[in-house]
């Protein structure tokens, strides 16, 4: 199909802000209500608003006798000693907890209910790293909107997402939660996800508070080891790490979560520069800051605070408003104020921020507005939501190789061999941080292929290899067999007879995520061995790589002829991949995180600066005295922005609306894109700039549109 599209891009120096859609009269009214309520509150009640507790107890009935933990939480709720709960989910459960707080406490201040709604609630979407590969901001916003609709129908009012950490190190397991290595694209995606969660009006029962996390530098943990120290210079801090936080703060995000790590020697939740000077004062952030789970207490482990009392002091005075599960404020903040160590005005300001968001949510008008069981039954896991999940999933798939034009699979193919543990895995596609997605509820790749071909094509399956010896749990390590080849014979047998082989390799869901850092990010077990055996007996092998991070496996990339990178795609994974395999959808995804050739290259990213000796000059070939590895190329296996299609596109020369651009000005770039191939397709048009001579060094490339 030959079609010309005229595209215009605006090159921006800063990310566009989402309009807050806030009426000044309403804002003034809310501020007046906050002040009036604050004047009525005792010190104990003020401190209570700054505590968040986990609801690891059943509140749908009487608090069980003998459960001391539950009894303490119930008593705190009745006294107004809790401002927010997390991990209480469901319209009925949140109603009961809200009732304890509102109908028993002196002032009846309602609770906010928080939860990690990261990439879907009941209907699960692609992991954020995968979703970012769509480069489709409308699709990403729709993903967050569906998640908000489902989560709020289950009583939740607050999500601890989006994670906006810019990540360069795939050894760090939490890259699966982010949008990759680029601050510009990461900022646009952060704003889209924030808009999807919060909408334009937080009083709308289909919207919820969003959280920009982790502030700041968490993804730069040394060696990719989770919770490790972070030491970065101001150039990296201001140009790479902070832009998504600044943009979301200025756009009106409801909350910011600080990070577990220290930043240049100061724990982030005790850093006044980050939280007070930068976020609240310079950027005008109007929401509140919450710590991560138990992280105020962890300032003791950092060697920054001598005990929990001092940790509470460091946190509140540096601008950390709410304490998540450290009990530092609960146990020590009242004492710190009464002793004069902490000014009551600091506490009042933190409480104002929390109350302000409760008024914005409309909780004082109706504290039970999110606890509607009929709405919950009607809005979870609907056909419409699954259709949206399938659409977003197919847009997130990246075609890395199609050398033999095996894809899309044509009608002449009558025998397909589907091989690999992951092909018949209904849990792994959900990824880590899967909200309330039910284990084993995803459409597997095998099911997706069977749904696509019906009885017209013979589909055979062999596991080939065993991925793990357990199903895994969120907070426990997985165990992998090293030498299980017992399934090879059956896999080879069906591969020999097939017209096309679909071979899955990659990672289980819980191999990435929090606490899942790895020094070896190659394929586990004998997956690569099976790939080599299968390609000996069939030339038409389509490799489907399912993983939560870039996988370092050069032999796989170099020896395969057809390769799809599908990440963990969520509820509709199998159907979405089948849409691409059989040409119902032409893949348009592009990588947002470079795939290294070797682990020793890490970090490898596209927007690096030029070295003083970047490459050998004329006559210097063979010289070692330039910035390179003696045993590997500098470039990644696949770079940021890479992804091919079933068709081809031709670009005209770009035209600029002007030859210069001043501070805070824009230049429009126009280009004609022609589809010169045989398939309909969509193209992600990327625009990069380079400032060749500047007062401070700039990257060799910077994405700007």
How should each PLM-predicted stretch be described?
Residues 21-705:
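Glycoside hydrolase catalytic-domain context in secreted enzymes
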């Amino acid at each position: 199909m030959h079609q010309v599209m005229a595209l215009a891009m605006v090159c921006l120096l800063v990310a566009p802000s989402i309009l807050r859609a806030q009426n000044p009269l309403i804002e003034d009214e809310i501020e007046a209500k906050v002040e009036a309520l604050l004047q009525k509150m005792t010190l104990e009640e003020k401190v209570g608003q700054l505590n968040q507790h986990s609801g690891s107890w059943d509140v749908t009935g009487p608090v069980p006798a003998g459960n001391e933990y539950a009894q303490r939480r119930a008593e705190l709720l009745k006294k107004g000693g809790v401002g927010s709960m997390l991990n209480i989910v469901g319209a009925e459960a949140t109603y009961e907890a809200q009732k304890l707080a509102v109908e028993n406490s002196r002032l009846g201040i309602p609770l906010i209910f928080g939860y990690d709604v990261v990439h879907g609630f009941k209907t699960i979407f692609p992991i954020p790293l995968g979703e970012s590969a769509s480069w489709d901001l409308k699709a990403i916003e729709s993903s967050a909107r569906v998640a908000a609709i489902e989560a709020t129908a289950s009583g939740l009012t607050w999500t601890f997402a989006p994670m906006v950490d810019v990540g360069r190190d795939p050894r760090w397991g939490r890259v699966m939660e982010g949008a990759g290595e680029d601050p510009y694209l990461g900022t646009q995606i952060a704003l889209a996800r924030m808009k999807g969660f919060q909408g334009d009006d937080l009083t709308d029962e289909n919207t919820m508070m969003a959280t920009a996390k982790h502030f700041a530098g968490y993804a730069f943990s040394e060696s990719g080891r989770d919770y490790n120290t972070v030491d970065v210079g101001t150039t990296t801090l201001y140009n790479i790490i902070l832009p998504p936080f600044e943009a979301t703060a200025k756009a009106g995000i409801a909350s910011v979560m600080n990070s577990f790590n220290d930043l240049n020697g100061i724990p982030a939740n005790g850093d006044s520069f980050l939280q007070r000077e930068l976020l609240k004062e310079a950027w005008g952030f109007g929401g509140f800051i919450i710590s991560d789970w138990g992280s105020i207490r962890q300032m003791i482990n950092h060697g920054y605070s001598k005990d929990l009392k001092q940790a509470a002091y460091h946190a509140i005075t540096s601008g950390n408003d709410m304490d998540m599960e450290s009990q530092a404020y609960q146990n020590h903040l009242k004492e710190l104020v009464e002793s004069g160590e902490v000014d009551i005005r600091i506490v009042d300001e933190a409480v104002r921020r929390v109350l302000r968001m409760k008024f914005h949510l409309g909780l004082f008008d109706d504290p039970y507005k999110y606890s509607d069981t009929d709405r919950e039954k009607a809005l979870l896991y609907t056909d419409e939501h699954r259709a949206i999940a399938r659409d977003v999933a197919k847009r997130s798939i990246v075609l890395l190789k199609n050398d033999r034009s095996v894809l899309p699979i044509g009608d002449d193919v009558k025998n397909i061999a589907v091989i690999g543990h992951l092909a018949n895995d209904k849990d792994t596609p959900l990824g880590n941080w899967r909200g309330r997605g039910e284990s084993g509820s995803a459409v597997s790749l095998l099911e997706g292929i069977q749904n696509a071909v019906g009885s017209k094509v013979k589909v055979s399956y062999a596991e080939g290899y065993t991925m793990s010896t357990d199903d895994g749990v969120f907070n426990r390590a997985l165990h992998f067999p090293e030498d299980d080849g017992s399934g090879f014979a059956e896999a080879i047998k069906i591969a020999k007879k097939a017209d096309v082989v679909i071979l899955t390799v990659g990672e289980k869901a819980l191999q990435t995520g929090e606490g899942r850092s790895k020094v070896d990010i190659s394929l586990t077990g004998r997956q690569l061995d099976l790939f080599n055996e299968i390609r000996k007996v069939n030339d038409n092998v389509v490799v489907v790589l399912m993983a939560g991070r870039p996988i370092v496996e050069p032999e796989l990339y170099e020896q395969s002829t057809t390769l799809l990178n599908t990440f963990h795609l969520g509820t509709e994974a199998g159907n979405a991949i089948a849409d691409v395999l059989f040409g119902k959808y032409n893949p348009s995804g592009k990588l947002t995180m470079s795939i290294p050739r070797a682990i020793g290259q890490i970090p490898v990213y596209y927007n690096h600066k030029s070295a003083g000796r970047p490459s050998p000059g004329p006559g210097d070939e063979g010289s070692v005295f330039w910035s390179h590895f003696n045993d590997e190329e500098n470039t990644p296996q696949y770079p940021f922005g890479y992804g091919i299609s079933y068709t081809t596109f031709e670009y005209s020369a770009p035209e600029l609306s002007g030859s210069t651009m001043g501070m805070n000005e824009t230049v429009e770039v126009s280009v004609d894109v022609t589809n010169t191939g045989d398939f309909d397709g969509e193209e992600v048009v990327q625009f990069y700039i380079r400032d060749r001579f500047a007062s401070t060094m700039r990257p060799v490339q910077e994405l700007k549109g």
